[in-house]
Amino acid sequence: MFDTTPHSGRSSPSSSPSLRKRLQLLPPSRPPSAPEPEPGTMVEKGSDSSSEKSGVSGTLSTQSLGSRNFIRNSKKMQSWYSMLCPTYKQRNEDFRKLFSKLPEAERLIVDYSCALQREILLQGRLYLSENWICFYSNIFRWETTISIQLKEVTCLKKEKTAKLIPNAIQICTESEKHFFTSFGARDRCFLLIFRLWQNALLEKTLSPRELWHLVHQCYGSELGLTSEDEDYVCPLQLNGLGSPKEVGDVIALSDISPSGAADRSQEPSPVGSRCGRVTPNLSRASSDADHGAEEDKEDQTDSQLDASSSQTVTPVAEPLSAEPAPPDGPTSNLGPLDLLSREELLTDTSNSSSSTGEEGDLAALLPDLSGRLLINSVFHVGAERLQQMLFSDSPFLQGFLQQRKFTDVTLSPWSSDSKCHQRRVLTYTIPISNQLGPKSASVVETQTLFRRGPQAGGCVVDSEVLTQGIPYQDYFYTAHRYCILGLARNKARLRVSSEIRYRKQPWSLVKSLIEKSSWTGIEDYFHHLDRELAKAEKVSLEEGGKDARGLLSGLRRRKRPLSWRGHRDGPQHPDPDPCTQTSMHTSGSLSSRFSEPSVDQGPGAGIPSALVLISIVLIVLIALNALLFYRLWSLERTAHTFESWHSLALAKGKFPQTATEWAEILALQKHFHSVEVHKWRQILRASVELLDEMKFSLEKLHQGITVPDPPLDTQPHPDDSFP
């Protein structure tokens, strides 16, 4: 653990990253046993004791420059921007302060931004150590702290927020259930928790080298450590985060003797040992995963765990390897995390029957990089000639660079210190098709060649490509490994693997943008290189007077490029035929984020999927509107021109030509006339009947209304006379 108590005169660990920087600032005359000042403290020229003044005055005069520079650097680390992007040391100190009741041996591995779902969402951070899962939230001084021991976890489950958004993890113990949501990279966090949980159940611990390797993969190479951190153990291979000068002497191929397939598969690579290398999932875990991207698919283990979004994982012991590694091999420190997979140890087993001893040695000693395997082809060209074509000022390389539109190409000669270990630097300018950014970018490529012996045909070339003048150029660079294996006199295999290495750990959104653009350019570059090598091979066979069609099928075997992400991306689709490549970007292996389409680009290359979807929706809407307009127009026309259509149809009919046809027409007309007359007769008859009924009704009405008049009396009555 980090020790924050002052210890003056305390020696720095030999593998501490800050010690190397401090030793470079010290003058050569400084004795190694001289006490070093504490970081962050000023060095006084005087002392309370006269004996200390006389004994230290000479040493202080020689290290004044180094002390000032070191103090300036320590003050810089505590500036305002360090609060916005804290280092791993600061995060670990915060972890120790927040969870002071944890054992002293617990060290922070990674932390994620998330929220705890209770009555309200409590936004905070989830801290993972080797044996504990901790959560801390502080909302307006309302603090929430949770500490869960991994051994007490009974169920680990992926969940969905509001049954829709897959960004939550549920952790259950015997007494409680904790629902954590708002993860930016839920699958990565789940996988890491699951593996640590299995380790805790199996009572297995990580070795210091594995632990620090995980920390480096999560936080990058700059951890902010000082000489006070004596428990730091530097991994020999940090996935490109350290150079051979920093991690130690380079292990030459000539110093390693072949001893067998099982032993050779566990030997270190020329740049350094690959022990303690975690799976690509863990290597890409971000400490600020709340900015998450779309994230990538998981490796084979995670794909089995993620059969459904709500899959529940129960503690099941992982099967142990049947063949343990030798105790002195680089894989002897591997714990239950399976940091070095069997697929990465053996690079090629499909052609073991025809491979020579040299190919078997190099394939076992030089595993591919952890990114992607881009070229795995056998060419009917000798290994020496293939090396000259790719790594010398050959006409093939010049023509290929011209096709990629590279300018200002400068190739420095190979260093002649040793034929087994050579080095050179290349500089050139690549075009960029980005309309908003720069139109070109300068590139510096450093190539290091390793060979088993001066007379050996095969070789390995490690290339580091730095692109300048592009966004986030100080965050990443690309690394490539060319492995040329001689199979026969005129037969060689070329394997090219690549990976993206980060100097600083970017946000997940920025990281996804970098990886998407870089991998697009890298894959296009090497696919183009593979096609050009195939053309050169064909030309070479034709010039030799051989039948190209008969020999190419038997002498050259092609393999589908594989993805070397530890099965993180799931099953890979086979690469299309080289002649039907639809995307060509000039950045290629040179890690330019913006690439220019090539001349053989297809008609639909480079179109975003969102634009295609929007175009399809617009076309469907236009078609529906056109159909609706046609139906309305048809109804209106039908309503106004029905009779005219009928008459027009009769007018355009076929006129009779013979007497028989005229007779038929007359008969039809007569029949039609008779039918019409009969109908009119019925109508008239019905009308007459109605009129008769009306007449009868009116007569009855008239009879009912008429009243007979009373008879008139002509004789006078006696009462009518006057008195």
UniProtKB/Swiss-Prot annotation:
Q: Residue spans with biased composition (Low complexity)? A: 1-18
Q: Which InterPro entries does the UniProt record give?
A: Cholesterol_transport, GRAM, PH-like_dom_sf, VASt
What would be the name of the gene that encodes this protein? Answer: Gramd1a
Does the keyword Nucleus belong to this entry?
no
Show the segment(s) annotated as Disordered: 1-63, 257-337, 562-601
Occurrences of domain VASt (ranges)? 370-541
Record-given protein name: Protein Aster-A
User: For this UniProt entry, which segments traverse the membrane?
Assistant: 610-630
Q: Where is the composition biased (Pro residues)?
A: 28-38
**GO-annotated cellular components:** autophagosome; cytoplasmic vesicle; endoplasmic reticulum membrane; endoplasmic reticulum-plasma membrane contact site; organelle membrane contact site; plasma membrane
Q: Where is the composition biased (Basic and acidic residues)?
A: 566-576
What's the stated role of this polypeptide? Cholesterol transporter that mediates non-vesicular transport of cholesterol from the plasma membrane (PM) to the endoplasmic reticulum (ER). Contains unique domains for binding cholesterol and the PM, thereby serving as a molecular bridge for the transfer of cholesterol from the PM to the ER. Plays a crucial role in cholesterol homeostasis and has the unique ability to localize to the PM based on the level of membrane cholesterol.
